[in-house]
Regions:
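Alpha/beta-hydrolase-fold serine-hydrolase catalytic core, especially in secreted/extracellular enzymes
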Residues: 1-61, 89, 230-367
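Flexible loop/turn segments at secondary-structure boundaries
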Residues: 59, 84-87, 115-119, 168-171, ...
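Cap/lid segment of the alpha/beta-hydrolase catalytic domain
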Residues: 69-156, 189-200
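Loop/turn elements at helix/coil->beta-strand transitions in domains of secreted/extracellular proteins
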Residues: 73-76, 103-106, 155-158, 179-183, ...
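Alpha-helical segments flanking ligand/cofactor-binding loops in enzyme cores
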Residues: 98, 172-173, 220
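Hydrophobic alpha-helical scaffolding
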Residues: 130-133, 137, 164, 171-175, ...
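Primarily recognizes the serine-hydrolase "nucleophile elbow" in alpha/beta-hydrolase
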Residues: 145-211
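The feature captures the conserved acid-bearing segment of alpha/beta-hydrolase catalytic domains
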Residues: 183, 195-253
């Protein structure tokens, strides 16, 4: 292979991934509306504001926007979430978001479909459906659209994606779907032999694109832009230093950009988003987005209670009147024949549960 050959394959992959994900049919049905915003909470060097963005009619994605208190144009990092217990509300997630914001990047995280406040609308079982794969990708793209349309303090030359585990899978997917991303950092997710154990990562047949692909090749389509792969010895990313990373270096080499892809491998660590993994992310974005590394101090981040990060109240009492309140209502937006294949079934549920059990997260808040 060479640069020209891989460039043609990249074009084919990007086109077919969109088709197999069904993303354009969903985006065509989305509404343009003002986000529901909470009051802004001020902390040491950054602020936090909750948002609820209507996507499909009556369907909302909820999250939080972490903004630096420094003036001027900022980098933007979209942060899809993984399956670690506590979701986007957990302590290490808030630490990462707040720290990157203090360093100078606007960071946005958001609930998985069927997690967090999304449960109010579709229930938790909806997450274990293939529909989650498409909707979560759609949410990431629409949040990027919203942020760029509503803010004047974003440097469009510095747009990143970063997530761990399933959030890492979606980080790669976002970079395939949208050319506006300029840096990518999937954490404890990338493997050539594993496409993500949850239907929200692998429910739609995107791995069959262009005659068959894998997440390592999808990540390679980001070349020659900066990309960090964080891996460890305790999960399916154990092979990254000997298999996936050399492959990525080869592809980046076609563009004379071998130095633009990096791997931080932690052989004695397990599947989590622990301090060493977060530090790798901070170093990467400080380098590629010129953030202020002197502001790297997680102890300055305030860990908020989960309820403070809700858009719809502690019991969902603020959910808008026209909001969808069942997973079946979401089905109306999918082609009926397609949706028959998407709906949560026992095999997908078993796959999801077996996968969670296999992780051995040793986390009191299991996925």
């Amino acid at each position: 292979a060479d640069k020209q050959t891989f460039g043609l394959r990249t074009d084919s992959l990007k086109k077919e991934v969109r088709q197999r994900l069904g993303i354009d049919a969903m985006l065509a049905q989305c509404v343009k509306s003002e986000a529901i915003l909470s009051k802004t909470r001020k902390f040491d060097g950054y602020t936090v504001q909750n948002f609820a963005l209507e996507t499909l009619p009556g369907l909302y994605v909820c999250g939080s926007i972490y903004t630096p208190q420094s003036k001027g144009k900022h980098a933007l990092i979209i942060c899809p979430n993984g399956h670690f217990g506590g979701g986007r509300y957990r302590e290490d997630q808030q630490q990462r978001m707040g720290t990157l914001a203090r360093m100078g990047a606007i960071c946005v995280d958001y609930d998985l479909f069927g997690w967090g406040e999304s449960i109010l609308q579709v229930g938790s079982a909806a997450h274990r459906s293939s529909a989650a794969h498409t909707i979560q990708a759609m949410n990431g793209l629409l949040i990027l659209d919203y942020m760029l349309a509503s803010r004047k303090d974003i440097d469009t030359g510095r747009i990143g994606a970063n997530g761990g585990s399933g959030g890492g899978t979606h980080t790669v997917l976002l970079s395939v779907l949208d050319d506006r991303f300029t840096a990518s950092a999937p954490v404890v997710s990338l493997a050539s032999h594993f496409d993500g154990g949850c239907p929200c990562e692998s429910g739609m047949p995107i791995q069959l694109s262009a005659g068959g692909t894998c997440n390592a090749e999808l990540a390679a389509t980001f070349a020659p832009l900066p990309q960090l792969i964080v891996s460890d010895g305790g999960d399916w990313t154990a092979s990254v230093p000997t298999l996936e990373f050399p492959y990525l270096q080869r592809i980046y080499g076609f563009y004379h950009a071998k130095d633009k892809v990096t791997n931080v491998h932690l052989p004695n660590e397990k599947h989590d988003f622990g301090p060493n993994k977060r530090n790798a992310v901070y170093d990467f974005f400080a380098d590629v987005f010129h953030l202020d590394k002197k502001k790297l101090d997680e102890s300055k981040v305030t860990i908020e209670p989960e309820a403070a990060m809700y858009s719809f109240g502690e019991k969902g009492e603020l959910l808008p009147e026209g909001a969808i309140r069942s997973f079946d209502k979401v089905a109306a937006y999918f082609d009926k024949k397609v949706f028959a294949r998407l709906n949560s079934d026992t095999s997908l549920e078993k796959k999801a549960m077996d996968w969670v059990a296999s992780l051995n997260l040793n986390d009191e808040r299991k996925a």
